[in-house]
Amino acid sequence: MRKSPGLSDCLWAWILLLSTLTGRSYGQPSLQDELKDNTTVFTRILDRLLDGYDNRLRPGLGERVTEVKTDIFVTSFGPVSDHDMEYTIDVFFRQSWKDERLKFKGPMTVLRLNNLMASKIWTPDTFFHNGKKSVAHNMTMPNKLLRITEDGTLLYTMRLTVRAECPMHLEDFPMDAHACPLKFGSYAYTRAEVVYEWTREPARSVVVAEDGSRLNQYDLLGQTVDSGIVQSSTGEYVVMTTHFHLKRKIGYFVIQTYLPCIMTVILSQVSFWLNRESVPARTVFGVTTVLTMTTLSISARNSLPKVAYATAMDWFIAVCYAFVFSALIEFATVNYFTKRGYAWDGKSVVPEKPKKVKDPLIKKNNTYAPTATSYTPNLARGDPGLATIAKSATIEPKEVKPETKPPEPKKTFNSVSKIDRLSRIAFPLLFGIFNLVYWATYLNREPQLKAPTPHQ
């Protein structure tokens, strides 16, 4: 019996439709299962990477030198301690290297991991040469980041707070500038095994955040990077160095030290305008200003380390102290000559009272009696000459006027000393010249940034 062609076509259409629907129904669950198994794929990749991995061995052991590329992002810089010669810095410290043992193939090109994986693989033993104390942040979890690319390149980032040494040369204090270094390198691997390089060009290898400065007495001018080799008893090591350039702000010290010193010197010179006979007033001026300068000198040194050399501020205070002390010595000199000498100005003359001349007559009972002995001549012979002498001897004596001498000019005190007149001009002039030379020298001087050779 022959089948109808229309029925057979219809049957084949139904079979194709059912097969298509069946295939879709079976395919949809398999795609969902694949998406759900991504975590399984990650786990399998990590397990395969760590299978037989020895984190005690550096990458390329026995074949090549391990290159570690680094860069730093500074989130906070400061404060800086002059007394301890150190500074504090908060950074994101990034290191990148290649480990062929960690190559993988999978649906992803980068594995984004945390600190748990970092503890299972080899990482550089980087330490800070001039670090006094370094802290890795652990709240709420260790602040570490790990990225592994499919070609085995790793990026390892951690957040650190480092308190590092900053050798300071304070000869120009407080107009000084410093280059505070941050030095790091491998602790155990010599340059024949591990070398460090900057990830980018020097200008971009170390970046400071715009709001990262935490400095009150300094301006952060910028930073420079460098690298070098340090020789030690165990070999040669690569050391990466970053210098942060600081310039001190002088405003605080002008208000706290310089202006009080200048005003004290000016106050000491006021005594030149007082009379040299004003001993108590001038003594108070001299002693008070000397004690004030002593107090200022002591307080200015409290915020600085005990260095064996004189700073620019020490020189200024010393000169001011010399001016104040010289003003006191000047008064002592004037007072010395005032007691032992007179200076006649030719104008002030005190008339001298007339001196009484001794009267040849003796005053007795309010009457004058001649001091000569009276005798009676013998007139018996009748000599007319003798009679005349006798007559004259009996005449009453007349009153004798005292002799007077013309008044002589008397020497008087001159209240203004020649030394005072000279000091009124010389002291302010010399102090002004000193200030002009001092400020012109230190403000226009280029700072000498010295950095000692690092050592291990």
Curated annotation (Swiss-Prot):
The lineage of its organism: Eukaryota, Metazoa, Chordata, Craniata, Vertebrata. Heteropentamer, formed by a combination of alpha (GABRA1-6), beta (GABRB1-3), gamma (GABRG1-3), delta (GABRD), epsilon (GABRE), rho (GABRR1-3), pi (GABRP) and theta (GABRQ) subunits, each subunit exhibiting distinct physiological and pharmacological properties. Interacts with UBQLN1. Interacts with TRAK1. Interacts with KIF21B. Identified in a complex of 720 kDa composed of LHFPL4, NLGN2, GABRA1, GABRB2, GABRG2 and GABRB3. Interacts with LHFPL4. Interacts with NLGN2. Interacts with SHISA7; interaction leads regulation of GABAAR trafficking, channel deactivation kinetics and pharmacology. The gene is GABRA1. Residues 1-27 form the signal peptide. GO terms for molecular function: GABA-A receptor activity; GABA-gated chloride ion channel activity; transmitter-gated monoatomic ion channel activity involved in regulation of postsynaptic membrane potential. This is Gamma-aminobutyric acid receptor subunit alpha-1. Pfam families: Neur_chan_LBD, Neur_chan_memb. It is a multi-pass membrane protein. Alpha subunit of the heteropentameric ligand-gated chloride channel gated by Gamma-aminobutyric acid (GABA), a major inhibitory neurotransmitter in the brain. GABA-gated chloride channels, also named GABA(A) receptors (GABAAR), consist of five subunits arranged around a central pore and contain GABA active binding site(s) located at the alpha and beta subunit interface(s). When activated by GABA, GABAARs selectively allow the flow of chloride anions across the cell membrane down their electrochemical gradient. Alpha-1/GABRA1-containing GABAARs are largely synaptic. Functions as a receptor for diazepines and various anesthetics, such as pentobarbital; these are bound at a separate allosteric effector binding site. 3alpha-hydroxy-5alpha-pregnan-11,20-dione binds at W273. 4-aminobutanoate binds at R94, T157. Allosterically activated by benzodiazepines and the anesthetic alphaxalone. Allosterically activated by pentobarbital. Inhibited by the antagonist bicuculline. Potentiated by histamine. SUPFAM superfamilies: Neurotransmitter-gated ion-channel transmembrane pore, Nicotinic receptor ligand binding domain-like. It is linked to Epilepsy, childhood absence 4: A subtype of idiopathic generalized epilepsy characterized by an onset at age 6-7 years, frequent absence seizures (several per day) and bilateral, synchronous, symmetric 3-Hz spike waves on EEG. Tonic-clonic seizures often develop in adolescence. Absence seizures may either remit or persist into adulthood. Belongs to the ligand-gated ion channel (TC 1.A.9) family. Gamma-aminobutyric acid receptor (TC 1.A.9.5) subfamily. GABRA1 sub-subfamily. It comes from Homo sapiens.
